[in-house]
Amino acid sequence: QEIVVENDVMKVRFSTGGGIVRSVTLKDYTRYGRQGERNEPIEMFVPESAKFDLSFFIKNGLNNVKVNTSEYTFTADPVVRTDTAQIVRMRLPVAEGAALEYRYVVYDEATPSRDYLVDYTVRLVGMAPYMANQSSIGIAWSNTSYRNERGFKNENMYTTVAYRVPGE
């Protein structure tokens, strides 16, 4: 299932397959086309290249079973609209009363300093008894960017993707 959320400056497509961001389109910027014309909206990355996977082990009786989130389909709640944002929430049930929850927040024009941001939060709901004595979760994240500028040198100089870990 695909979930589409838009604000004034971007369109974000989410997929319940793996609970991932499938694509991001910037509305106010254009990229150079094949003939040198600048009329195509900027796609931040090739949708087919969107790879995101959390891996961890859960207890299943006497065994530990590896979970790779990219191999599962999440269930999505309806998109919640607030005065300043739209919230996409997806859950992956792991056991009775236990789930992995992804929460994405796409801000709107009421918060212009955040309008190009997508906040992402992972919650382990009721999972402590199932977490197989581990203190960390593995993450694998990769995307292939489109070439949006004429020159490779300029593109490398001005392209940035950033993340922040809460508490840092």
Residue ranges and their predicted role:
Residues 1-168:
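Soluble non-transmembrane domains of integral membrane proteins
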